[in-house]
């Protein structure tokens, strides 16, 4: 008997368990249940309120706090990103050496998907520029890069808010912006407004198809675009008599051996004053043939350094004026708010024409 | 063109064979790394780069060893190890005034740079206070001078090569005429030629002179010397008149100094991690007169700067450095005591340099960090790979993009790259034995696209230059004769008549007005 039972048991070990489709397999004998339930999961890295460590000085604590918040600017939730920007806005440090970190983390948010983040960012840029004069000039290369990218972005909402950032630059760093990025900004404007530089069929049809995709919100945004365009043209095509920063030297009252001596002082608010000269930029050579008729052409646009006022005026007159005037005229005909803004842009261009005429007469 | 920053550190004293030390040359304006040098460490100011680009050299005095390591640009390991009579603590190079002019004029135009080129003189200061001067193209030792009583901390040539300035731990600073130092071949009797005095010996400081800079003026009369010392002072001297111009007193010991290329400001690195801007010109807020600060032996106490308008703070931060340094491995190797010791040590700003256009300041500190910061906003623009020990030298030089990137085909073989062995005994007085081999560079002008007319015009220019005895270069331009046909003649006559009548009219009007004017004046009187 005993042997029979043993035999049966032994045989059982070698029987293959039958698996049935649609039924979960039986757990093995040595299975341990490791599942657990929890009401909340906390991810301390991703929370805004962070417990500060004890035993560090107040200054260091602030710094740790700031770097923690800066890492949160890449947080997946747009609400958190916005909260973080507001926090930074309220806790901007007085130590200038921390601003590099801040700017490298917040500049990419120009292309943020969420509108509320972008509006908060505009306010933050404004505050930074007020706290540290010259800071926007210092980072203008990357800021302008992202703004141009925003102006030509696929997402219409990002395009719409792009000129708000441009407006910050026009207000706080007009000189550096127009010296280094006049041509690029003008070109981006053409894409933004879906205007064309040339009249050939291909580009016109492209512009029409893109303008067909323009919805109601985009039409409204054009008012803002035109207002900024007006400010931008005013800043870059006319001499700037007084600089915004109050620390700048007032030439009228300075007494010196030579009346221009003050120009050789270290500037108080213009950082990287020589950057627009592109002394140290390694640029690709231009392959297009030169047409030497004393005018700029569209093919030249990539290589022009519009550092001085005269070049900017010449580039504008030679290349941009005709298509800009044409498109503005059609906007004026539309009437309404857009028409009014377009009209005020036109007055700027008229002013320029008159001034150029006067210069020509004087000569 | 690109600007390259070279930096080197003092080396970890525990690392006997300097396996972990390296020196780098990196661009300021982009992220490119131009060159790196392995096993390179030097005492403060003990490394010197002759320039950036192919064919240039790095000369490094090995710390506490009577040895000089020579690297070529583009090669990582040392090319040569040259034994010396004594361990050197600081080095300086100077170009020959004639070849410097030559290379400046012809750098881009007519002649190529020679592929083998060495600077003219190498000067070194030693721990015992001696100054050594070698001629690099022959390797002969021209001078050994007992200049100081203690370790020489810095030697520098003026850009024109006229003066050599040395600073030392014995709180003195000496200025030497280069011609006195190398006058081995002239003197007939030993005594007078060997026992020359310094051009100027400065004994104003009370503690060690840590660094000095000379400005680069167009005329030598403007040559100024800026010295800094552990006794908290920055002093400005006029070398030609041997006058102390200004003394600035700061709140901390000063470790390093650099001057604005246009002489508008001086930047000093302090022993508490701050960099202070000391403006040399300002606009007086009361009278709004643009005036220079100091001069006339004034003593100026630099006030503390609560608004941080003249202070760079970034070297004081310790957190970022710890993040770089304290990898887990590092923590395990070093015991905790060492770490806390490090944390309590104040951070010195050990070296400073300035970019070509005077808008960027490059600074290195005792933790081995190197930053580029914008001068106007005092912000860090760039952070370089940190070294493991205090930064001992920073140099900025600019060169075209092509020169900086070493291509493999243009490499010179080792035999033609090496500099001659530096001699350990003074050279003989026999000037006839002094022989030099120099490469005469080929003309870089492209002969193919030159036509006969261009050649002819060049020859006439050369002819003119040859015949010209005065300093003025002028040539007479012949204007082709106008064929005097009657028509043009008449036209010209008409014009003349018109002009003369207009002139007489104007003249009479002017006289009339003048009369009126004098009448009015008389009436008033």
UniProtKB/Swiss-Prot annotation, chain A:
Nucleus is among the record's keywords: yes
Stored Pfam families: Ipi1_N
Compartment annotation: Nucleus
Entry GO CC: cytosol; nucleoplasm; rixosome complex
Gene3D superfamilies attached to this UniProt entry: Leucine-rich Repeat Variant (1.25.10.10)
Gene Ontology molecular function terms on file: chromatin binding
Region of interest: Disordered: 1-38
Keyword list, A-Z: Nucleus, Ribosome biogenesis, rRNA processing
Top-level taxon of origin: Eukaryota
Biological-process GO terms, alphabetical: maturation of LSU-rRNA from tricistronic rRNA transcript (SSU-rRNA, 5.8S rRNA, LSU-rRNA); pre-replicative complex assembly involved in nuclear cell cycle DNA replication; regulation of DNA-templated DNA replication initiation; ribosomal large subunit assembly
N-terminal signal peptide: none
Family label: Belongs to the IPI1/TEX10 family.
Record's function text: Component of the RIX1 complex required for processing of ITS2 sequences from 35S pre-rRNA.
Subunit structure: Component of the RIX1 complex, composed of IPI1, RIX1/IPI2 and IPI3 in a 1:2:2 stoichiometry. The complex interacts (via RIX1) with MDN1 (via its hexameric AAA ATPase ring) and the pre-60S ribosome particles.
Protein name as annotated: Pre-rRNA-processing protein IPI1
Organism (species): Scheffersomyces stipitis (strain ATCC 58785 / CBS 6054 / NBRC 10063 / NRRL Y-11545)
Phylogenetic classification of the source organism: Eukaryota, Fungi, Dikarya, Ascomycota, Saccharomycotina
UniProtKB/Swiss-Prot annotation, chain B:
Subcellular location: Nucleus
Keyword Protein biosynthesis: no
Record-level GO BP terms: DNA-templated DNA replication; rRNA processing
Listed InterPro entries: WD40/YVTN_repeat-like_dom_sf (IPR015943), WD40_repeat_dom_sf (IPR036322), WD40_rpt (IPR001680), WDR18/Ipi3/RID3 (IPR045227)
Residue intervals passing through the bilayer: none
GO cellular component: nuclear pre-replicative complex; rixosome complex
Predominant cellular place of this UniProt entry's protein: nucleus
PANTHER family to which the protein is assigned, alphabetical: WD REPEAT-CONTAINING PROTEIN 18, WD-REPEAT PROTEIN 18
Similarity remark: Belongs to the WD repeat IPI3/WDR18 family.
Full protein name: Pre-rRNA-processing protein IPI3
Organism classification: Eukaryota, Fungi, Dikarya, Ascomycota, Saccharomycotina
């Amino acid at each position: 008997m005993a042997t029979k039972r043993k035999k049966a048991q032994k045989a059982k070990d070698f029987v293959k368990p039958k698996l049935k489709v649609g039924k979960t397999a039986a757990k093995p004998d040595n299975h341990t249940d490791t599942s657990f339930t929890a009401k909340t999961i906390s991810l301390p890295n991703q929370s805004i309120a962070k417990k500060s460590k004890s035993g560090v000085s107040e200054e260091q604590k602030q710094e740790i706090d700031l770097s923690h918040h800066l890492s949160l600017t890449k947080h997946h939730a747009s609400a958190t990103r916005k909260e973080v920007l507001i926090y930074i806005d309220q806790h901007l440090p007085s130590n200038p050496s921390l601003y590099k970190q801040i700017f490298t983390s917040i500049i990419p948010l120009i292309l943020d998907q969420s509108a509320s983040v972008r509006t908060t960012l505009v306010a933050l840029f404004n505050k930074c520029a007020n706290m540290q004069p010259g800071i926007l000039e210092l980072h203008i290369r990357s800021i302008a890069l992202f703004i141009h990218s925003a102006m030509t972005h696929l997402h219409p909402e990002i395009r719409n808010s792009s000129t708000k950032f441009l407006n910050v630059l026009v207000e706080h760093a007009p000189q550096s912006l127009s010296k280094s990025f006049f041509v690029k900004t003008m070109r981006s404007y053409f894409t933004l407004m879906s205007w064309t530089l040339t009249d050939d069929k291909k580009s016109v049809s492209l512009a029409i198809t893109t303008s067909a995709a323009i919805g109601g919100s985009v039409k409204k945004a054009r008012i803002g675009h035109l207002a900024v365009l007006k400010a931008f043209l005013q800043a870059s095509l006319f001499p700037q008599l007084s600089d915004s920063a109050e620390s700048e030297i007032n030439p009228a009252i300075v007494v010196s051996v030579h009346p221009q001596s003050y120009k050789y002082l270290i500037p108080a608010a213009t950082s990287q004053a020589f950057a627009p000269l592109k002394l140290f930029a390694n640029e690709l050579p231009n392959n297009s043939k030169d047409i030497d008729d004393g005018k700029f052409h569209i093919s030249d646009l990539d290589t022009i350094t519009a550092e001085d006022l005269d070049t900017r005026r010449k580039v504008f007159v030679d290349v941009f004026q005709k298509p800009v005037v044409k498109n503005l005229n059609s906007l004026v005909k539309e009437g309404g708010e857009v028409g009014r803004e377009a009209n005020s842009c036109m007055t700027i261009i008229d002013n320029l024409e008159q001034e150029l005429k006067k210069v020509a007469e004087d000569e | 063109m690109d600007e390259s920053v070279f930096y080197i550190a003092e080396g970890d004293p525990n690392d006997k064979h300097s396996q972990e030390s390296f020196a780098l040359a990196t661009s300021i304006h982009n992220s490119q790394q131009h060159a790196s040098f392995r096993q390179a460490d030097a005492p403060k100011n003990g490394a010197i780069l002759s320039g950036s680009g192919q064919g240039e050299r790095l000369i490094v005095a090995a710390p506490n060893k009577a040895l000089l390591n020579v690297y070529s640009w583009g090669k990582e390991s040392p090319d040569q190890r040259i034994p010396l009579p004594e361990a050197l603590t600081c080095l300086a190079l100077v170009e020959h005034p004639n070849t410097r002019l030559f290379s400046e004029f012809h750098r881009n135009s007519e002649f190529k740079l020679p592929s083998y080129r060495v600077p003219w003189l190498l000067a070194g200061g030693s721990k015992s206070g001696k100054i050594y001067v070698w001629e690099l193209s022959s390797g002969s030792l021209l001078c050994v001078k007992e200049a100081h009583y203690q370790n020489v901390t810095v030697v520098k040539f003026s850009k024109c090569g006229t003066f050599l300035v040395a600073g030392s731990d014995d709180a003195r600073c000496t200025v030497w005429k280069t011609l006195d130092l190398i006058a081995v071949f002239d003197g007939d009797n030993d005594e007078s030629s060997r026992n020359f005095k310094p051009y100027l010996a400065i004994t104003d400081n009370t503690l060690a002179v840590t660094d000095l800079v000379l400005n680069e003026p167009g005329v030598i009369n403007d040559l100024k010397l800026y010295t800094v010392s552990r006794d908290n002072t920055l002093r400005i001297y006029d070398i030609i008149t041997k006058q102390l111009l200004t003394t600035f007193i700061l709140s901390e010991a000063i470790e390093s100094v650099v001057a604005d290329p246009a002489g508008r400001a001086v930047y000093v690195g302090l022993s508490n991690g701050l960099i202070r801007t000391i403006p040399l010109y300002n606009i007086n807020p009361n009278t709004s007169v643009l005036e220079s600060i100091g001069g006339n032996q004034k003593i100026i106490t630099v006030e503390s700067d609560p608004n941080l308008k003249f202070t760079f703070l970034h070297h004081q931060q310790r957190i970022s450095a710890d993040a770089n340094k304290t990898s887990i491995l590092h923590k395990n190797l070093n015991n905790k005591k060492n770490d806390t010791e490090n944390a309590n040590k104040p951070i010195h700003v050990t070296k400073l340099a300035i970019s070509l256009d005077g808008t960027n300041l490059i600074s290195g500190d005792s933790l081995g960090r190197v930053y580029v910061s914008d001068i106007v906003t005092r912000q860090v623009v760039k952070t370089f790979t940190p070294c493991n020990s205090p930064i001992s030298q920073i140099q900025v030089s600019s060169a075209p993009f092509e020169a900086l990137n070493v291509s493999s085909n243009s490499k010179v073989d080792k035999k033609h790259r090496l500099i001659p062995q530096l001699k350990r005994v003074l050279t003989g007085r026999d000037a006839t034995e002094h022989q030099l081999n120099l490469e005469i560079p080929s003309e870089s002008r492209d002969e193919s696209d030159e036509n006969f007319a261009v050649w002819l015009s060049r020859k006439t220019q050369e002819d003119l230059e040859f015949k010209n005895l005065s300093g003025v270069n002028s040539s007479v331009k012949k204007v082709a004769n106008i064929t005097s046909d009657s028509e043009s003649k008449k036209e010209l006559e008409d014009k003349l008549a018109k002009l003369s009548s207009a002139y007489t009219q104007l003249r009479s009007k002017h006289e009339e007005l003048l009369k009126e004017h004098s009448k009015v004046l008389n009436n008033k009187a």
